Amino acid sequence: MSEEIREVKVLEKPWVEKYRPQRLDDIVGQEHIVKRLKHYVKTGSMPHLLFAGPPGVGKCLTGDTKVIANGQLFELGELVEKLSGGRFGPTPVKGLKVLGIDEDGKLREFEVQYVYKDRTDRLIKIKTQLGRELKVTPYHPLLVNRENGEIKWIKAEELKPGDKLAIPSFLPLITGENPLAEWLGYFMGSGYAYPSNSVITFTNEDPLIRQRFMELTEKLFPDAKIRERIHADGTPEVYVVSRKAWSLVNSISLTLIPREGWKGIRSFLRAYSDCNGRIESDAIVLSTDNNDMAQQIAYALASFGIIAKMDGEDVIISGSDNIERFLNEIGFSTQSKLKEAQKLIRKTNVRSDGLKINYELISYVKDRLRLNVNDKRNLSYRNAKELSWELMKEIYYRLEELERLKKVLSEPILIDWNEVAKKSDEVIEKAKIRAEKLLEYIKGERKPSFKEYIEIAKVLGINVERTIEAMKIFAKRYSSYAEIGRKLGTWNFNVKTILESDTVDNVEILEKIRKIELELIEEILSDGKLKEGIAYLIFLFQNELYWDEITEVKELRGDFIIYDLHVPGYHNFIAGNMPTVVHNTTAALALARELFGENWRHNFLELNASDERGINVIREKVKEFARTKPIGGASFKIIFLDEADALTQDAQQALRRTMEMFSSNVRFILSCNYSSKIIEPIQSRCAIFRFRPLRDEDIAKRLRYIAENEGLELTEEGLQAILYIAEGDMRRAINILQAAAALDKKITDENVFMVASRARPEDIREMMLLALKGNFLKAREKLREILLKQGLSGEDVLVQMHKEVFNLPIEEPKKVLLADKIGEYNFRLVEGANEIIQLEALLAQFTLIGKK
């Protein structure tokens, strides 16, 4: 077996999965937890479990998938093969940017961290109404709009016809004019180059188009000899003899839009449409010679916000909005086609963007905040977008008002008479109350009038009138007298009477109402479903997406090469034959295998709460699994909920009830990074296991085992570099090892720091020491070397500076000052300041501190 083939085999599967512990004995560095879990296996019973600890991939497409990278259109396989050198597994990259969407559905450009190549024996093929076709791995998430209006990431294997796939409504490509691009559009639409003798012909019935082609030819190719003739059958033709023009067209592929065409894509599309565009009864149709060209034209049209449909080799533009945009942005040179197309704007229906609206969620927001916007049940997407804007304006006002009311109602209105006694002289003067009368109030021998109570409270800094006014506003706008009355244990008319009366007898009850209303405000402001609804409305108004209905979902079996681009943070990018938005747990599995043996899969359900956070997951998936009895003689089933701290408060409450309901035959294992985010009623029902970061020696032992098994040479320097970066995280350590192995079978510290996008710690320390010793310019030079040559971000450098500052040979007070400065400048970077300027300013601070 050759080295090249052997290396491909080594890297064809993520090692973090390949070397995942299968049994409890395989788990490294958590002996205190393994011991307790083994006891559960031995006894055959266990309580609900909560795994808490610090945070520890595969989403792939086929190689023929189109992707826009650095402003150009590539095939994904071609791009990854070029960047990875054909290697399987992850390959770190720098300077590669792709288009994706942010949390509000707006198009943005994102950095790619690494490219990935792998094999699979199973794919999901997806077709849509507009002619899109995607082939992705079964677990690849796609952004989908479901029948009930939900918008969420769904794994490909769970998609079904009728779901709506997110596609960008436009692509921010260069859309300018260019005479060469226009000439190429004409040539590729109606031109022909003879195999020899430098002859090019151009055939078109329209004399104006032939004239334009000849003008462009004369302008672009000075050596051209041009003549026009009419054949005996009446066919008009332009003959061009030009070595330069002939060489150009023979150097490009005629099945794709050439690079020169993309540089002036508006000009190219107009010329191509003049030649190959036709007007049908309800659409403009652009004919092509092959599917690849049709796909590229669809991408090009998307850059103008024109959503096209593919039908074989035809690109179809339909709907008034699309046709009008096409005519405004691209158009036809010929008046006859232009007039025909303009008639379609009046004939065709207004385009619907196809989004199913989540009326239930919108209604919840309206009811929760008592919004006054008129409801329209049969909303089109466009009307829903307008409604969301109206709602958002009202919501911002209401939330702002609720915060103001909360601030006012946070202050008690009961007077502390001991405090009045201390300030009696001031009260007598400002409240204008006689001394003997005030003394009786302080002793409780008589009560002040309500007016006097208000004046006394003012002296103590209590604004009773403002608080009562806030209570009235909340009761009328956000609650009801009936709701407050139920909580108070009285009738609603009593609440109204109390709030509007002016007797001091009601002050104690007013204080109770204040507390009730404050509690209700806090419930509203912390309502998870309300926040979800507001986020949905923001998305509805701001998103730059169109929704294409899925018509077919089919499973494919075979041996497939697949590719991925890893985009940290947002985990999605624009790809597909037409632009589409595509995306980017150990102890529980080991315990399930030990408990259930071969039947573990039948008795084990795994869910990721960060993907499936809503209350419906608890009500549907969990309950459906929990209702059935365990298989194979097991006494209970296991439901493993990863990233449980991502569940909403409502979902956690539903989970608590489900845990109680099915406690006889189901045990829950909840895994989270922060147990504090799990509600107390759930924590009290679980045995809690706190996973600690692994010791370096435990990680080192596992890495040496993997390296030996994979035929790698793991140097001591390389091992120490991995341990330094991993910081007790085994998953991170294994991923770094695999990424470094993609570069070389010898794992050195140089390769490790390269793939992990980290600077050497000694380089960071040297830079800081240079600054502290007063050598600012050399420190600045070292900083620029780290940033520019090693390609690190400013935040990466700051994180390492913070880690290394405590290892510097300086006095402790200076370390405190430096750590404080690093924190300050990190905040500046997070706020969006220029990283080079801020880091150089930080080094200047180091220099000043070093002189003290």
UniProtKB/Swiss-Prot annotation:
GO molecular function: ATP binding; ATP hydrolysis activity; DNA binding; DNA clamp loader activity; endonuclease activity
Keyword field contains ATP-binding: yes
UniProt xrefs under Pfam families: AAA, Intein_splicing, LAGLIDADG_3, Rep_fac_C
Ranges for domain DOD-type homing endonuclease: 183-306
SUPFAM superfamilies associated with the record: Hedgehog/intein (Hint) domain, Homing endonucleases, P-loop containing nucleoside triphosphate hydrolases, post-AAA+ oligomerization domain-like
Annotated effect of mutating E795A: Decreases the stability of the PCNA-RFC complex and reduces the clamp-loading activity
Tree of life domain: Archaea
Gene3D superfamilies to which the protein is assigned, alphabetical: 1.10.8.60, 1.20.272.10, Hedgehog/Intein (Hint) domain, Homing endonucleases, P-loop containing nucleotide triphosphate hydrolases
PTM info: This protein undergoes a protein self splicing that involves a post-translational excision of the intervening region (intein) followed by peptide ligation.
Keyword Nucleotide-binding in record: yes
Biological process according to GO: DNA repair; DNA-templated DNA replication; intein-mediated protein splicing
Keywords per UniProt: ATP-binding, Autocatalytic cleavage, DNA replication, Nucleotide-binding, Protein splicing
A single cellular component GO annotation: DNA replication factor C complex
Xref: InterPro entries: ATPase_AAA_core, DNA_pol3_clamp-load_cplx_C, DNA_Rep/Repair_Clamp_Loader, Hint_dom_C, Hint_dom_N, Hint_dom_sf, Homing_endonucl, INTEIN
Family: Belongs to the activator 1 small subunits family. RfcS subfamily.
Quaternary assembly: Heteromultimer composed of three to four small subunits (RfcS) and one to two large subunits (RfcL).
Other comments on record: The intein interrupts the potential ATP-binding site.
NCBIfam families (UniProt xref): intein_Cterm, intein_Nterm, PRK00440.1, PRK04132.1-2, PRK04132.1-4
Function: Part of the RFC clamp loader complex which loads the PCNA sliding clamp onto DNA. The complex possesses DNA-dependent ATPase activity which is further stimulated by PCNA.
Name the UniProt record assigns to this protein: Replication factor C small subunit
Species of origin: Pyrococcus furiosus (strain ATCC 43587 / DSM 3638 / JCM 8422 / Vc1)
Gene behind the chain: rfcS
